[in-house]
Amino acid sequence: MWRRGSACAILKEGIVMHSLMRVGAGILLSVGLMASSGCGGSGETLHLEVLPPQQPVQVAEPEAVKIVIEPFEDRRADKHRIGMRTHLWGGVTNFNVTGEKPGEVYAQALADRLRASGWLDRSWDVRVAPAGSAPTADIVISGQIFEFAANAKSRMFSTYITTSNKLTITARNNVDRSSTSRSLEGAQTDTVVWFSEDDVKKLMTATVKDTLDRYLADTTISQRAVRPSR
């Protein structure tokens, strides 16, 4: 009886020790994975390419209306970055757009969209040019950016990502000296288990695309001028 009791005790102890070792190994693996995925930030800056990809429409020639888009004015309080990732174990990683000028990014994104499939689902003759350099253009589009942000907060086993923007786009019509302005803002969120900078890039790109989609939905082009669609 004593021997059988001792054997049972030893067996139970072995099972407990094996279970504890498996739990410990799991914890160490999780810690290692979190550490390797960057739970501590060094303050570096990641530059994100956020121009939405375009699928051009099939047209013979662009519409015969000359459109110039000026780089948007950046009126954000902090122009050194568009946001940051707060790491689980302290520290941050900063985010910025490629070229570090959101105003140029937005102007180029709008130009790409109009060339591919703009108003009335047509391609338009459009280029980006410095302010005041194209006085004879039929339409000159400018803008002001008040918010252009991308942030991520790492938590245990997940990272919460937010993107947002707020801006005004103004189209000045040469034909009658009129203008049309639209104020736009939007935000998107996502939660991921394994974080990468592509997650922020995709969400920011989607935010830019959504803003441009709404601008084109709110406006139209008629008689060589941009007008409210309703």
Positions of predicted regions on the chain:
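Short, Lys/Arg-enriched N-terminal segments with co-localized hydrophobic residues
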Residues: 1-16
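Bacterial N-terminal signal peptides that target proteins for export
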Residues: 15-27
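Generic short beta-strand segments
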Residues: 71-75, 144-150, 185-187
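A structural "domain/chain start" motif
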Residues: 38-109, 217-230
